[in-house]
Amino acid sequence: MFKSLTIKSNKVKPREENDENKQDPDPSNQPQQSTRQGENKSENKSLQTKMTPVTFEESHAKMQDKISEKNSLRDLTTNPNHQHPTESKGAMSEQKEMETGKEGLVSPKSKPLGVPVINEYADAQLHNLVRRMRQRTMLYKKKLAEGDISSPEASPQTAKPTAVPSTQESNAKLKEEHYYHILCFKFQKMPLTEYLKRFRLPGSIDSYTDRLYLLWLLLVTIAYNWNCWLIPLRLVFPYQTPDNTHYWFITDITCDIIYLCDMLLIQPRLQFIKGGDIMVDSNELKRHYRSSTKFQLDVASVMPFDVFYLFFGFNPVFRMNRILKYTSFFEFNHHLESIMDKAYIYRVIRTTGYLLYTLHINACIYYWASDYEGIGSTKWVYNGEGNKYLRCYYWAVRTLITIGGLPEPQTSFEIVFQLLNFFSGVFVFSSLIGQMQDVIGAATANQNNFRISMDHTISYMNTYSIPKNVQNRVRTWYEYTWDSQRMLDESDLLCTLPVTMQLALTVDVNLSIISKVELFKGCDTQMIYDMLLRLKSTVYLPGDFVCKKGEIGKEMYIIKQGEVQVLGGSDGAQVLVTLKAGAVFGEISLLAGRGGNRRTANVIAHGFANLLTLDKKTLQEILVHYPDSEKLLMKKASVLLKKKAPATETTPPRKGLAFLFPPKQETPKIFKALLGGTGKAGLTRLLKLKREQTIQKTSENSEEGGGKRREYEDKEREPSEKILDSSECRANCIIAEEMPQSIRRAALPRGTTRQSLIISMAPSAEAGEEVLTIEVKEKAKQ
């Protein structure tokens, strides 16, 4: 222990001596250490010259740090076995440089002579801990300088880069690549892939609303009609020759391609309804199409019987199966009629086409029969002159329509053929004529109903001898109503539709008009929809009164078409304002109370006006289900009524010094009734009666007093009573003269000052008046 103390005392020596005692066992490192020691000496000298003066506490703390560093360095030199195996010579040299740098901050004169060690083991452990921490710090510093350090914790896995930026960059590059310049202008050319995306077929097709599908059906219908009309023609008439066979073949191949595309690409994508749900799944759509009869007919219509051309020649009979694709033709007719405004026109054209096609087939059969019998062999067959098709078609028209005038058949074949032709002609022609009648009748059904209604009305007016001017106005109303809306009552049309469809139609037609009404802004949307369903359309002729001044208002009017004029003025003929389409009037009458729902002006139709009306009863039925909207409407109605109320009369301006005196307030009505119209005299009389009642009450309470006191009071009151009686008599006379006959009976008689009075008021027979009644209560006899 003593040796350790003597060793520690050696640390008081200067830095240079201590460094000389430390020598590296490796002689090769001695020159390096000497050079470093020289550098440390020069640094210490420079630091000592530049050191600023410090306090005693700061110098003492620095000395303590230096002593601990010296102890750790002593352990390293005396116990080389405790050195960390991973420590390098470079780290030791850097540590020495740091220690020498710290020594330079303290002058040798300020170093303490020695510090006693209390516990050698604890001191050694602390020095060992400090040494290891410094070694580790130096190691990490070195790795940080080299850039090889990494966190001891596992770093999180980096997410895979998304392909969105790359695709966006690629799209931007593609767009830049497809720009081309012409002169000083820059144009963009869309790439081929963008064009192809436009023609990509959707996963499912709605056959009821998709117009592109309707165009496709038109193409399929054209191909179908080509086969229906020209296959029989080419089969019978000699119009297909070896010279033009390639043209017919190209057209046939085109029609077959259309058939195949429809069967493989379009039909398997058509949506259908299953259990009320619209099916859009591709597998389900394909399964449904393959299990339908339409698929079987489509497959039969594209069967490649054309291969028999190789064995039997180019004969159109092998293409007869193309006529089996009739389902697409009828589907096209159905969808086209559903989107046309006047579908009956197309129905007439289609029925006419059926008739022409029947005549076409009959003409082909007649030419085949003539060829079978021999052209020109008899008078009945075709003689071979003129255009073959036109002559045969003419014969078919005269035969089917049973016009007659044709040559008589000669052979049995001709007779049987003609009989069958007559029977089929009568059947086909009658059915087509009947169908044509149905089409035309359905197209004119509404007009027929209008004519029937108008005829019944005119018959009624003639029966009761209605004036001619009224009849003319009724006829005008019928004609204008039919010309404007093609029906007499719109509700008859809407009543056949469900409520949701009615609401959809009325919202599109009338919602923009009803939303302009200030009274209904802020109300429940569902309440507005219910109102739209209850609106009624009414047509007014020029000069008709929509409403008159003073009548009870029960309806609100919305101008749908036309104009109306509001009349007023002294004579009631001055046009105050002209209301046009979209204007609303009469809305206050729907919610006003008694006395506030009368019309304030005359409103007439300037021309033909179509108005939407909503009556008060209907609105009340609607508001039962919407209490919040009802409260809001009541508030708005009260505000609108106040705005439209007539302004109160303004008092004339005061002149002179009259503004210094406030205006005299009006006497309340109750006081006027009590006074009975006598003014101040009546008020004096009432006060006197009140005073007498109080005196009478006090006299009754003081009955215990002696009779002498009563006699004395009676004697004193006699002269006063005489004065009162005389004054009351004069007052009563004045009141009787001023009061009307109905109130004069209520005057009090004389000599009732000591009795109790009962004053009451009752309504008079005249409006706005009340009668004051005063009853005298008789005193009970003792």
UniProtKB/Swiss-Prot annotation:
Q: What is this protein called?
A: Cyclic nucleotide-gated channel beta-3
Question: Which ranges of this chain reside in the Extracellular compartment per its record?
Answer: 238-244, 313-315, 367-388
Site described as Central gate, positions?
429, 433
Record-linked PANTHER family? CYCLIC NUCLEOTIDE-GATED CATION CHANNEL BETA-3, CYCLIC NUCLEOTIDE-GATED CATION CHANNEL SUBUNIT A
Membrane-spanning parts: 214-237, 245-265, 295-312, 316-330, 344-366, 389-415, 416-440
Q: What is known of its domains?
A: The cyclic nucleotide-binding domain (CNBD) comprises three helices and a beta-roll of eight beta-strands from CNGA3 and CNGB3 subunits. Upon cNMP binding transmits the conformational changes to the C-linker domain of the S6 helix to open the ion conduction pathway.
Query: Gene for this protein?
Result: CNGB3
Question: Can you name the source organism?
Answer: Canis lupus familiaris
Q: Where in the cell is it found?
A: Cell membrane
Query: Its domain of life?
Result: Eukaryota
Q: Where is this region: Disordered?
A: 1-111, 147-168, 692-724
Q: Where is this region: Cyclic nucleotide-binding domain?
A: 525-641
Which transformation does this protein catalyse, written as a reaction?
Answer: Ca(2+)(in) = Ca(2+)(out); Na(+)(in) = Na(+)(out); K(+)(in) = K(+)(out); NH4(+)(in) = NH4(+)(out)
